[in-house]
Swiss-Prot record:
Gene name for this UniProt entry: argH
InterPro entries, per database record: Arg_succ_lyase_C (IPR029419), Argininosuccinate_lyase (IPR009049), Fumarase/histidase_N (IPR024083), Fumarate_lyase_CS (IPR020557), Fumarate_lyase_fam (IPR000362), Fumarate_lyase_N (IPR022761), L-Aspartase-like (IPR008948)
Protein name according to UniProt: Argininosuccinate lyase
Keyword terms, alphabetized: Amino-acid biosynthesis, Arginine biosynthesis, Cytoplasm, Lyase
Organism of this sequence: Acetivibrio thermocellus (strain ATCC 27405 / DSM 1237 / JCM 9322 / NBRC 103400 / NCIMB 10682 / NRRL B-4536 / VPI 7372) (Clostridium thermocellum)
Pathway terms, separated by semicolons: Amino-acid biosynthesis; L-arginine biosynthesis; L-arginine from L-ornithine and carbamoyl phosphate: step 3/3
HAMAP family the UniProt entry points to: Arg_succ_lyase
Pfam families: ASL_C2 (PF14698), Lyase_1 (PF00206)
Subcellular location per the Swiss-Prot or TrEMBL entry: Cytoplasm
Length: 458
């Protein structure tokens, strides 16, 4: 007999039990469910809704059940539907009618809202730790490559010289925003819904603030109808994780490009590469490719959540059971990707000579050549046109700009002097860009210092 079966004259069909049950995936919330029930039982006793003796017995038995689950001594039942009913059924089997008092003043609607909030806030903390580890790795790579020059790209065409440190710190900023988004999302997750009942609260004199304090929530929900039907926090976290994966995917794409012979900027460690079943020479960046591929999976989880919640009337609907597999999958995927990605970039070999050689080609100093003329008094648009013609001349004559002799320079502008060679050297092109946020050494070091300060607060 179901715990809710009093109104029914027959048992549910086995196919309905199988279809309706969520225990196979929501069982992972057993700890949060039991901790929430312990706090609820403690509050029921303190508020004299049940006796103190019964409250203590329920709490102690729930702790025993938690220990037994963690030791693998408990087998959940499909016909008990979900983690909430499974735990309650086990409780009743151990202490009889006293266990039946636990659900006083509570519905599964506010109970599941509590469990998922407690579960997700724990996961946010774990993901944030993984991100901080990634950020520290990026800073170490940046420190070791302050003077490593490579071309910066636009449209995947060589554009201007930067440093590898500057490039790594660009990704640091992306993941910093991810941490900030998670921190902000955490605020809306960490709101306590218990006491909202099925939808209209309860007539019992519950102390919601006590339960919130016991469970470490910052505040309580302010509308019972909203509290049991709200999954914004789930969708918001899914969106945060989707953006995070987008950043990992962009980084992965560059890793894949850089590891190719066409770029040759890095070599991935053997431990983070794979081979081919037919081509003996292959060393494939499978980790980066799989991270890139799993990004679409996390996007799909977000779209699934949005689709489930679309058009649902207030308050709780069974559709909302579908929220868990999507958010669990997104969380699991991110937690799987971050550690292996961090180790992959931590162990990769930086080919500084190849990076410099690439920066020396492709006229990456052309903008600085135009700026040189501007500093001599030529309007920028005129300088832009002059240097465009100079680049065309260099292409036709198979020369780099810095390889032109003075007579060739003078053919484009009489204002060009011997100092041009120093001004358009790659090192000067980089060091001259010393504004805050620029690629110059002092600018990147300041960015690293700011990054370390940020991480110290996480």
């Amino acid at each position: 007999m179901k715990l809710w079966g009093g109104r029914f004259e027959k048992n549910t069909d086995k196919s309905v039990d199988d279809f309706n049950s969520s225990i196979r995936f929501d069982c992972r919330m057993y700890k949060q469910d039991i901790l929430g029930s312990i706090a609820h039982a403690k509050m029921l006793g303190k508020c004299k809704i049940i006796s103190e003796e019964d409250s203590i017995l329920i709490q102690n038995t729930l702790r025993e059940i938690l220990k037994d689950i963690e030791e693998g001594k408990v087998q959940f039942e499909i016909d008990a539907e979900d983690i909430h009913m499974n735990v309650e059924k086990i409780l009743i089997s151990r202490i009889g009618d006293v266990g039946k008092k636990l659900h006083t003043g509570r519905s599964r609607n506010d109970q599941v809202a509590l469990d998922i909030r407690m579960y997700l806030r724990d996961e946010v903390v774990e993901i944030r730790k993984l991100l901080v580890n990634l950020e520290r790795t990026l800073i170490e790579i940046a420190k070791n490559n302050i003077d490593t020059i490579l071309p910066g790209y636009t449209h995947l065409q060589r554009a201007q010289p930067i440093t590898f440190a500057h490039h790594m710190m660009a990704y640091f900023q992306m993941f910093k925003r991810d941490i900030e988004r998670l921190n902000d999302c955490y605020k809306r997750i960490n709101v306590m819904p218990l006491g909202s009942g099925a939808l209209a609260s309860t007539t019992y004199p519950l102390d919601r603030y006590m339960v919130a304090k016991e469970l470490g929530f910052d505040s309580i929900t302010e509308n019972s109808l909203d509290a049991v039907s709200d999954r914004d926090f789930v969708i918001e976290l899914s969106a945060c994780l989707s953006i995070l994966m987008m950043h990992l995917s962009r980084f992965s794409e560059e890793i894949i490009l850089w590891a190719s012979h066409e770029f040759g900027f890095i070599e991935l460690d053997d431990a983070y590469s794979t081979g081919s079943s037919i081509m003996p020479q292959k060393k494939n960046p499978d980790v980066a490719e799989l991270v890139r591929g799993k990004t679409g999976r996390v996007y799909g989880d977000l779209m699934a959540l949005l689709s489930v919640m679309k058009s649902l009337p207030l308050a709780y609907n069974k559709d909302m059971q579908e929220d868990k597999e999507a958010i669990f999958d997104a969380v699991d995927t991110v937690k799987m990707c971050l550690p292996v990605f961090t180790k992959m970039i931590e162990t990769m070999k930086i080919k500084k000579e190849n990076m410099l050689r690439a920066a020396q080609g492709g006229f990456t100093n052309a903008t600085d050549m135009a700026d040189y003329l501007v500093k001599k008094g030529i309007p920028f648009r005129n300088a832009h046109e002059i240097i465009g013609k100079m680049v065309l001349y260099c292409i036709e004559n198979n020369k780099a700009i810095e390889e032109l002799d003075m007579s060739e320079f003078k053919s484009f502008s009489e204002l060009i002097e011997e100092d041009v060679y120093e001004e358009i050297s790659l090192s000067k092109c980089v060091s001259g860009r010393n504004l805050p946020g620029g690629p110059a050494k002092e600018s990147v070091m300041a960015s690293i210092e700011n990054g370390l300060k940020f991480l110290s607060t996480q």
